[in-house]
Amino acid sequence: MISDKSPPRLSRPSYGSISSLPGPAPQPAPCRETYLSEKIPIPSADQGTFSLRKLWAFTGPGFLMSIAFLDPGNIESDLQAGAVAGFKLLWVLLWATVLGLLCQRLAARLGVVTGKDLGEVCHLYYPKVPRILLWLTIELAIVGSDMQEVIGTAISFNLLSAGRIPLWDGVLITIVDTFFFLFLDNYGLRKLEAFFGLLITIMALTFGYEYVVAHPSQGALLKGLVLPTCPGCGQPELLQAVGIVGAIIMPHNIYLHSALVKSREVDRTRRVDVREANMYFLIEATIALSVSFIINLFVMAVFGQAFYQQTNEEAFNICANSSLQNYAKIFPRDNNTVSVDIYQGGVILGCLFGPAALYIWAVGLLAAGQSSTMTGTYAGQFVMEGFLKLRWSRFARVLLTRSCAILPTVLVAVFRDLKDLSGLNDLLNVLQSLLLPFAVLPILTFTSMPAVMQEFANGRMSKAITSCIMALVCAINLYFVISYLPSLPHPAYFGLVALFAIGYLGLTAYLAWTCCIAHGATFLTHSSHKHFLYGLPNEEQGGVQGSG
């Protein structure tokens, strides 16, 4: 029988602080060669009034986080949705972005209130075996995301060079450019954030240009955006809608955002400062994801206009009669609906609107791949340091991640063809969706715990909304698996799927169980997991020191 009485509450030096489990005093960590080596001061202003100077000081983490909404996997998902369903799935893109904002809001609040990122909190609360398994799944998500960035960058080099740079060469080039970008943050945190802002601007301008030249029907676009219907849709459209959600909400991005917000100097001994930081980070994230939504909308609308219901024969004839006739051979001469990817997408834009459209598309794709590369590096370092307390330099970290990403990508690029490389991109979108519960469940667990978040714990409405998000994610994953099973090439693969499913469902069930405990389901609590109700045994739970 578990007592409903919580342990005595003691005073503590800062708001939402989390101490580790009893044990030897930790040794001082070496200087961290990460994004967090520099803190941005927050200017003073009258309490209770909105300040543009303060908003500017808080601006940065949200835009870095938003880059995961614009990676090559998202671009491919957008263009395929446009080609398959026209403008009918724009409302799915809108609401998937809103769901993503809700998840990122929780991540930012955890980092601000506790002063720890999600990986660090997982290290404190989960036992060793679930913690290691959880870390491995997030590392898998990061490697999968990095593979998408490698694919997108390699294809952009191939398009920009008119095919002179083979795909496998483009993959190898990504090794060099990644290490080049690692030196950028030596020039200061704000300059690094400004560079990411430049890459987002390049994407907005390039994909915005495609939108202008394609000139999609504004009435049909607005209808697809506001009406949550899909008349005449079947399984292909439904699978594409599921793919949009999986591509938009990425698991490693939740861990990343919870760490990025720690780069601002927030006095966590003052309740009012914590509340203010939460507000400004939410405003910044809303602006950043609004920009990412507009860019994704540009891509989906362009291909909804240019590709929807188009056959391979029609695409072949368009290219054969254009200045890019050498590209016509990539489209088979049949009456099947064209199956588009990020390579074919650039080609058909060039055939329809001139070579400039192709090269501008490739530049936008290159910007998407490069920006995502750096944020993936930071996510990997934060996750490794949080879960394992293992300090690696950025150089070593990116070498590990990029090596894991490049090997399978090079093999596909060398021994298979472009279609298989783009198909790998689609498979990686499915992987990201399957791994999403391993980020959403922990963030929902810890942000719902008063022992961790104090008065900033999720309220009933927030818990209801985020629980619905989790149910939606699980339903999406189940649908993905059921839809994918018939496509397995050999019955022997079913055994591998079953083995994977046992581990996957076991870890998901454990995380769901602890999440229910954190939501107050005391009847589910085991004596070994009382800390999900009351906090860690030696955790100090007092109020705020200072004014509030």
From Swiss-Prot:
InterPro entries: NRAMP_fam. Glycans are attached at N321, N335. This is Natural resistance-associated macrophage protein 1. Glycosylated. Keywords: Endosome, Glycoprotein, Ion transport, Iron, Iron transport, Lysosome, Membrane, Transmembrane, Transmembrane helix, Transport. The chain crosses the membrane at residues 56-73, 83-102, 140-160, 165-184, 194-214, 238-256, 285-304, 347-366, 398-415, 427-447, 464-485, 494-513. It catalyses: Zn(2+)(in) + H(+)(out) = Zn(2+)(out) + H(+)(in); Fe(2+)(in) + H(+)(out) = Fe(2+)(out) + H(+)(in); Mn(2+)(in) + H(+)(out) = Mn(2+)(out) + H(+)(in). HAMAP family: NRAMP. Macrophage-specific antiporter that fluxes metal ions in either direction against a proton gradient. Localized to late endosomal lysosomal membranes, delivers bivalent cations from the cytosol into these acidic compartments where they may directly affect antimicrobial activity. Involved in iron metabolism and host natural resistance to infection with intracellular parasites. Residues 1-29 are annotated as: Disordered. Belongs to the NRAMP family. The keyword Kinase does not apply. One of its GO terms (cellular component) is lysosome. GO terms for biological process: antigen processing and presentation of peptide antigen; cadmium ion transmembrane transport; cellular detoxification of cadmium ion; defense response to bacterium; defense response to Gram-negative bacterium; defense response to protozoan; establishment of localization in cell; inflammatory response. Induction: In response to lymphokine, such as IFNG, or bacterial products, such as LPS. Induced in macrophages at early stages of infection. It is a multi-pass membrane protein. Pfam families: Nramp. Residues 74-82, 161-164, 215-237, 305-346, 416-426, 486-493 are extracellular. It comes from Mus musculus. PANTHER family: NATURAL RESISTANCE-ASSOCIATED MACROPHAGE PROTEIN 1, SOLUTE CARRIER PROTEIN FAMILY 11 MEMBER. Disulfide bonds: none annotated. It is found in: Late endosome membrane; Lysosome membrane. Macrophages; spleen and liver. The lineage of its organism: Eukaryota, Metazoa, Chordata, Craniata, Vertebrata.
